[in-house]
Regions:
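Catalytic core of non-heme Fe(II) oxygenases with the double-stranded beta-helix
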Residues: 175-179, 183-186, 190-285, 295-296, ...
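Structural marker of alpha-solenoid helical repeat scaffolds
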Residues: 27, 57-61, 90
Length: 314
């Protein structure tokens, strides 16, 4: 019953999904994940009160962010403030909570008290690393050739890429050029942290003493893009740009950062955004809790980048 419910949920046939999820609970009421999926169904059919009641019963990695979202939709500001205050003490570096608290604080016009990164748009940094690469005898073409030996998958299910292909887990491959780039990134990440060392937020003050890289690559074709998302497992995220289409207009092929994502309802329309149109050799760094997406472009050229997160180990 649970599997059938998931099939219908993915097909956006919410009433059918609800029927099968309820049947799965008849057989096993301890399946707390089912309550989360029931919450998803009811939220998608705009029964937010019922969705909230199920989210509260669930134990899922997204449970608290969904409850906060429901409080926002239902305009329950005091309940939102009470819960975010509690979460701030118990779970101060949850990137999903950081993302939604930054957005809801803006929409409710209140101070963002969640300590991870209250003003994430202030922590975007762009730097051209061409000289760094030249100093390490590292060529863009060398990176491109090394990475493209890995199989790229077109519009991989469950990922954010539309009109493009991706190759994941590049850290598992022994690519000399990528190892050289990783050494450059370690240095630039240290510089990034030093640049923001006086900022009073968990993101900086609880910076990882040890971390590991998760590295992948995206290639976008004409009119391709990445939908808005965050990297909840990361601490700091970034990208190095290997190919940028020529003859593009305005912000085409750019990366747009925003407090808004996840199709959150919009009450105040003037939402802060920052758009960067990168050049080849550019490195862009930002908190993993910050929503970002790419802007489609029209060109016969590709847009290719190496993307990465650092994951906190200690």
């Amino acid at each position: 019953y649970l599997n059938l419910g998931m099939v219908y949920l993915n097909l956006r046939k919410y009433q059918e999904a609800i029927k099968f999820f309820n049947q799965s609970l008849v057989h096993n009421k301890k399946l707390t994940s089912v309550y989360y999926y029931l919450g998803e169904c009811y939220k998608n059919i705009n029964d937010v009160d019922k969705a909230l009641s199920y989210y509260i019963l669930s134990h899922h990695q997204k449970t608290y962010s969904k409850i906060l979202e429901c409080y926002f939709i239902l305009n329950k500001k005091k309940k939102y403030q009470k819960l975010i205050s509690s979460i701030s003490k118990d779970d101060p570096d949850n990137r999903r909570i950081a993302a939604i608290s930054a957005y809801i604080s803006h929409q409710f016009n209140i101070r963002n008290i969640y300590p991870f990164c209250q003003n994430p748009l202030n922590f975007i940094l762009k730097k051209n690393i061409k000289k760094n690469m030249e100093n390490d005898s590292l060529e863009i073409q060398e990176l491109i050739e090394g990475i493209t030996k890995k199989k790229f998958t077109w519009e991989l299910f469950g990922k954010t890429t539309v009109g493009g292909s991706s190759a994941y887990n590049l850290t598992q491959l022994e690519i000399t050029s990528l190892s050289k780039l990783q050494n450059i990134l370690v240095s630039e990440i240290s510089n990034y942290k030093e640049n923001f060392k006086n900022e009073n937020c968990t993101f900086i003050q609880k910076w990882p003493k040890k971390y590991k890289f998760n590295i992948w690559s995206n290639i976008l074709k004409s009119e391709g893009y990445n939908t808005s998302h965050i990297h909840p497992a990361g601490w700091l995220s970034g990208g190095v740009y290997l190919k940028i289409p020529s003859n593009i207009k305005k912000n085409e092929a750019g990366i747009e950062f925003s407090l808004h994502g996840e199709n959150y309802p919009i009450k105040i329309k003037n939402i802060p955004t920052i758009t960067i149109v990168p050049k080849v050799y550019d490195l862009v760094l930002f908190p993993s809790s910050l929503f970002h997406k790419t802007i489609p472009f029209k060109s016969s050229d590709e847009r290719m980048m190496i993307a990465f997160d650092i994951h906190k180990l200690q």
